[in-house]
Amino acid sequence: MRKIWILLVKLSGWHFEIPDLKDRPELRHCVVAVAPHTAFADYIVGAAVLFAAGVRPKILVKKEFFNFFTRRLLLHLGLVPVDRGNRHNDLVEKAVEMLKNDDNVCIVITPEATRKPVKRFKRGFYEIATKAGVPIALGFMDFKRKHAGYGPTILELVPLHVEQQVQKQIVRQIVVLETATIQES
């Protein structure tokens, strides 16, 4: 099923930038912060990127996407329903447990926690990485070029204002991608 999923996403024109996990084993077991979050398709493409890298994703998405028709497929793809309306859902602890129970899993989070523009990222991705003792990898998607990937930068866990550091690095990465697109034109 996963190979079929990768094939379908690639047939739709997507190209993946995937790190060599032999050289970067830390990318096999990490928190992936993906931005910008623009559509539900982010999860579909993101799952294919991690499948292609040989990693099992656990992608946290709002529970409203799970219904009678989609639930089985989404769970098989590694999507995990999250009740965002319940502040006492122990989401950080559950994600940490997923990481501690499996050395070949990446927790994938969109730190904006919404598709709307935000000034600051939420801190959950940092708390999960810190408590699980895993690094944070940056993920990206460029819908204009149909280019997606993860892992070009690993952040050391620095407690002071880490969400702003991640946000700045993702913005820099997007600017580089947009500059490359302009130069190709």
What residue spans do the PLM features occupy?
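Soluble catalytic domains of membrane acyltransferases
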Residues: 14-173, 182
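Alpha-helical transmembrane segments and their immediate juxtamembrane flanks
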Residues: 177-185
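N-terminal membrane-anchoring alpha-helices
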Residues: 1-17, 182-183
